[in-house]
Design a protein with these regions (language model features):
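Exposed beta-sheet edge and beta->alpha loop/turn motif
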Residues: 102-130
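Short, low-complexity N-terminal intrinsically disordered segments enriched in polar/charged residues
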Residues: 1-49, 60, 154-157
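Conserved functional loop/turn residues at catalytic and ligand-binding sites
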Residues: 39, 81, 132, 150
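Short beta-strand edge/turn micro-motifs at domain boundaries
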Residues: 2-5, 95, 119-149
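A solvent-exposed, acidic/Ser-Thr-rich amphipathic alpha-helical stretch
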Residues: 21-25, 29, 40-94, 98-101
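Juxtamembrane/interface motifs at transmembrane-helix termini
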Residues: 63-66, 117, 154-157
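Residue-level signal for pocket-adjacent positions within structured domains
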Residues: 10, 48, 103-106, 113, ...
Length: 157
């Protein structure tokens, strides 16, 4: 087998997900672009009907219902940006270390827009199978986001 420069055997080995490491990296690059385009439909297309998505802000969703939850976030933060700071791939488990920024421009979960910006870091833990995300656990400080956009007050420590 001839490899492109900079490519390792590990990059080309298919995992249980049916994907190579290189394909997994491409999937998450495409997901980052979909976040930047506020494209909930493309993001939801990476899930199966039985996928489980757990989120501090939206609760637990099954399947492509995640599109509705993402749509609500995208509607509230029209300038939302997401950056993949690091991607850790261990077999069919992928952890994306992420940074988010945006401005609260429209209602969110019943809170009127404040016009305030937020910056948030977090990690999304994904399990892949058959080229799809079958489980996603989002870990981030949702309370901190609410404080930053001014809809929740916090007392100094």
């Amino acid at each position: 087998m001839t490899l492109e420069p900079g490519t390792t055997i590990e990059d080309t080995r298919r995992l249980e997900s049916g994907m190579t490491r290189r394909e997994i990296v491409a999937l998450f690059k495409r997901r980052q672009e979909a976040y930047e385009d506020l494209d909930a439909k493309t993001l939801a297309g990476d899930y199966t009907d039985a996928s489980v998505i757990e989120s501090p802000s939206a609760g637990v969703h099954t399947g492509r219902d995640a599109e509705k939850a993402l749509g609500a976030i995208f509607d509230a933060f029209l300038d939302l940006t997401m950056t993949v700071d690091d991607l850790v791939i261990d077999g069919d488990v992928v952890v994306a270390i992420l940074s988010f920024e945006g401005t609260h421009m429209r209602p969110l979960l019943g809170f009127e827009p404040t016009g305030k910006r937020f910056h948030l870091s977090g990690a999304f833990v994904h399990r892949l199978k058959d080229r799809k995300i079958i489980h996603e656990r989002r870990v981030y400080d949702f309370t901190g986001l609410l404080v930053q956009i001014g809809v929740l007050k916090a007392k100094p420590a």
